[in-house]
């Protein structure tokens, strides 16, 4: 990038989208940003408070004017009173990294290098493959090799750059996804030709599916005499990873990480898929990307590896990552060589930050320190509020029980998987993210943390270190040795999660035949039951001349000055209506009870 060439500012993009949503009716559409009270909603849509309260009363919901309505309830009221509705996202410092859309014009976009993560079962050759690729790149680099672990590196194949994120495995991949980072474009799944699909292979596939990342399969160890390629294809097809040879959409590459067989084919396949994915970015803007890793060096201070995904990062740029900001002092490529700038699709080692960002933090680059500082400060101040909003939002989503199943033998794991899926109800969906054989491991904990899952471990000993990690990550591991106890436990969870629905059923009618006034209580209605019955604390409607006057509940129920629990047809009783005194002789009372509706 030329020094004189100006970059598009992220400041203008963000400022343009930072907004406070004005709650109002516009062209028959009610615009709102979140929950509000009945009184607030009534005022905004020009409907009386009583109309809204009565609407919810008929749904067995006893609300007052200060009750806060959920987004779904606001939508219900809008539809009830003939309005369309639209929720608009309010964007501020607490959520701008997630909500701000950076839209570049097509003419400004150009292809960027793909970003690859290699995953696979232990001992299937993931590390050997990465080592071979890394050494190949070092050999081509005349200025020397990589002297430190940077978390990411680049290779050049036929003039095209490919990025590899070098992580310890599924754990790091999941940690990034847990923090909302979408950094990987393609996953290369390594499967040993002489071993087949193993537990961590399934884990990797589940991780990829959860992150919606396409998979290229590298069938490794093709130099082994006991390889069985058909077995690999069959086992992977059962997991919805189907080779193109069989009409599927997954590219399979056959080779050996030890000898280098198939590596060039793998590179070609990556570039082909990257072309299909149309990975593009605008190099002429300030940078946006993800923190790959960071550490504190005793001499250099913070050293961080960043993946630039859009825009160009330069020395002296200010960046906001997490809820802090800093200024870039130096840039190095992953070979440790100084560079002047890092375009899109470039892993870069930076110094100058006065804090250590976390892996998976998204970062934005700016030329204005004032704006970066303001955003970081506001984001920090809103962190606790933001967490509360997330929890509230999660509670209002469709109810899903996420589960991970681990067992000592495959047959039990399969049986549990099948049995648990059948325990879902109409209101509560059960999603089994992963089921497998063997002890609960770090990858299980991280997947559970990411997806808010419960881990069920059948007939397994959980290592103390794993229990400690689960506790720290606030992940539940439930250990069992009897299947029906797992079933009973999940049934209780499903019952506890479902929204209890009630139907308001009319149980009786009465006529007010006398009224009295007591200064300590208010109006007392003397009533005669015309049909059905009245019960203690039942809900009522008061009607006068065929017009609904009041919806509420009775506060007491007495016969001959003695409190009673119910009064049957043909009998008389006295009652006081809660916080309501405007009664007249001849008024009709209708009694209602909430009845729970079974699914």
Swiss-Prot record:
Sequence segments annotated as region (G1): 120-127
Region feature G4, mapped onto this chain: 220-223
Keyword field contains Protein biosynthesis: yes
Chief localisation class: cytoplasm
Domain annotation tr-type G: ranges: 111-278
Protein residues bound to GTP: 120-127, 166-170, 220-223
Protein name (record): Translation initiation factor IF-2
Gene this chain is encoded by: infB
């Amino acid at each position: 990038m030329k020094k004189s060439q100006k970059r598009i500012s992220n400041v203008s993009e963000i400022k343009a989208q930072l907004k406070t949503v004005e709650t109002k009716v516009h062209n028959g559409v009610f615009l709102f940003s979140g929950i509000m009270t009945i009184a607030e909603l009534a005022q905004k849509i020009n409907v009386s408070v009583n109309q809204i309260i009565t609407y919810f009363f008929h749904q067995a919901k006893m609300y007052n004017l200060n009750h806060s309505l959920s987004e779904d309830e606001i939508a219900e009221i809008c539809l009830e009173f003939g309005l369309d509705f639209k929720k608009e996202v309010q964007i501020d410092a607490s959520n701008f990294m997630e909500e701000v859309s950076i839209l570049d014009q097509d003419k400004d976009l150009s292809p960027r290098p793909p970003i690859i993560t290699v995953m696979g079962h232990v001992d299937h050759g993931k590390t050997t493959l990465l080592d071979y690729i890394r050494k190949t790149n070092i050999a081509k680099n005349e200025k020397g090799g990589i002297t430190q672990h940077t978390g990411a590196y680049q290779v050049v194949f036929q003039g095209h750059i490919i990025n590899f994120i070098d992580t310890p495995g599924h754990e790091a991949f999941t940690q990034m996804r847990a923090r909302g980072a979408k950094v990987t474009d393609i996953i290369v799944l390594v499967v040993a030709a002489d071993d087949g699909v193993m537990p961590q292979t399934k884990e990797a596939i589940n991780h990829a599916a959860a992150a919606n990342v396409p998979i290229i399969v590298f069938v490794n160890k093709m130099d082994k005499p006991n390889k069985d390629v058909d077995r690999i294809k069959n086992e992977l097809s059962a997991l919805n990873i189907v080779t193109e040879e069989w009409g599927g959409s997954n590219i399979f590459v056959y080779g050996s990480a030890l000898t280098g067989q198939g590596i060039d084919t793998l590179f070609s396949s990556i570039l082909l898929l990257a072309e299909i994915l149309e990975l593009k970015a605008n190099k002429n803007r300030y940078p946006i990307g993800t923190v790959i890793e960071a550490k504190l060096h005793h001499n250099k201070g913070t050293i961080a590896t960043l993946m630039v995904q859009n825009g160009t990062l330069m020395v002296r740029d200010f960046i906001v990552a997490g809820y802090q900001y800093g200024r870039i002092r130096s840039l190095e490529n992953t070979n440790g060589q100084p560079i002047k700038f890092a375009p899109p699709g470039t892993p870069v080692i930076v110094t100058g930050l006065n804090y250590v960002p976390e892996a998976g933090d998204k970062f934005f680059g700016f030329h204005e320190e004032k704006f970066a500082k303001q955003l970081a400060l506001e984001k920090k101040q809103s962190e606790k509020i933001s967490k509360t909003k997330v929890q509230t939002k999660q509670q209002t989503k469709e109810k899903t029980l996420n589960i991970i199943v681990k067992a000592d033998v495959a047959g039990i794991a399969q049986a549990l998987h099948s049995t648990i899926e059948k325990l879902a109800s109409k209101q509560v969906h059960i999603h089994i993210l992963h089921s497998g054989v063997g002890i609960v491991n770090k990858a299980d904990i991280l997947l559970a943390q990411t997806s808010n899952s419960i881990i069920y471990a059948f007939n397994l000993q959980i290592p103390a270190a794993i229990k400690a990690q689960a506790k720290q990550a606030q992940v539940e591991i439930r250990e069992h040795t009897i299947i029906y106890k797992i079933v009973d436990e999940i049934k209780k969870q499903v019952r506890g999660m479902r929204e209890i629905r009630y139907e308001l059923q009319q149980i009786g009618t009465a006529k007010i035949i006398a009224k009295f006034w007591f200064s300590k209580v208010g109006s007392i209605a003397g009533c005669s039951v015309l049909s059905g019955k009245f019960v203690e604390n039942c809900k009522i409607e008061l009607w006068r001349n065929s017009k609904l006057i009041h919806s509420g509940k009775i506060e007491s129920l007495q016969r001959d000055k003695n409190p009673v629990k119910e009064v049957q047809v043909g009998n008389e009783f006295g009652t006081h209506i809660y916080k309501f005194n405007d009664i007249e002789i001849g008024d009709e009372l209708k009694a209602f009870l909430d009845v729970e509706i079974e699914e």
